[in-house]
Design a protein with these regions (language model features):
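Conserved glycine-rich cofactor-binding loop
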Residues: 14, 21-22, 45
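Short C-terminal tail/terminal secondary-structure segment
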Residues: 2-7, 153, 232, 243-265
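Active-site loop immediately N-terminal to the catalytic Tyr-X3-Lys motif
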Residues: 106, 153-159, 181-182, 219, ...
Length: 265
């Protein structure tokens, strides 16, 4: 009797995870490493990745930290070259680096708007562009752009963020159409409510947290390991016929039946 197919096995694969010094980036990197991938992990300061590098190495995988400022084109080009040189190839990109400004729309400044759009949308495009240039000659690649549940509807208080994540969803579809002929799939993973540095102030408000739980159909916010299966699937050979899609991992909140405002009560 033959052995079962080792689904979602990333052994021998090299994954680049941007913004991996903390938060969701570490969740994604950890899941990929546990599935066998070696990692290139980025942050604006390489030293910020030191502890996570040690963690990945403790799992028996290799990890290389690379500095990356997604708002700087020269930094993106340099990072892509260093990422490829680290292991000789790039199989997977998890395009995760992002930021948010939490203010009423009437109070958002020009610079704050630009910060969010340049990081979340322009940065996502040019990181994907430069990594795709490394993937195209090999005719293989898995690109996972990290979006948000805000790509399907808006929330008060984070208008630029919603605009940027909606843009990532559409960008994903366009890149999937353009690069599919080169064996590259491009998908968007859109988490719902997960505790991160960006929304810590909300999660520290117990009244708001109970309000949120009541409006998520599964009655709880996301936990780190709730994202593992989704990111590993989209990074693996098993997703070879899935491209241009947005996978919402949100406990059902995007059904629209109940909605939680980002405003504290």
């Amino acid at each position: 009797m033959s052995n079962p197919t080792p689904y979602f096995n990333l052994t021998g694969q090299v994954a680049v995870v941007t913004g991996a010094s903390r938060g969701l980036g570490q969740y994604f990197g950890r899941a990929l490493a546990k599935s066998g991938a070696d990692l290139v992990i980025t942050s604006r300061r390489k030293d910020d990745c030191a502890e996570f590098v040690k963690e990945v190495e403790s799992l028996g995988r290799r990890a290389i930290p690379v500095e990356l400022d997604v708002r700087n084109f020269d930094s993106i080009v340099k990072f892509a070259d260093e990422a490829e040189a680290a292991f000789g190839k790039i199989d997977i990109l998890v395009n995760n680096a992002g930021c948010n400004v939490r203010k009423p729309a009437v109070d958002i400044s020009w610079d704050e708007y630009n910060l969010v759009l340049e990081t979340n949308l322009r940065g996502t495009f040019f990181v994907a562009q430069q990594i795709a240039k490394k993937m195209i000659p090999r005719e293989y690649g898995r690109i996972v752009n990290i979006g948000s549940v805000t790509c399907v509807f808006g929330y008060a208080g984070i208008a630029p963020y919603c605009a940027s994540r909606g843009g990532v969803k559409q960008l994903t579809m366009a890149l999937a159409d353009e690069w599919g002929r080169f064996g590259i799939t491009v998908n968007c993973l859109a988490p719902g409510w997960f505790r991160t540095e960006q929304n810590k102030v909300l999660y520290d408000n117990q009244e708001w947290l109970e309000y949120l739980k009541d409006r998520i159909p599964v009655k709880r916010p996301g936990q780190p390991n709730d994202l593992d299966g989704a990111v590993v699937f989209l990074a693996s050979e098993e997703s070879r016929y899935v491209s241009g899609q947005t996978l919402l991992v949100d406990g059902g909140i995007s059904t629209g039946a109940t909605r939680a405002s980002v405003q504290t009560k």
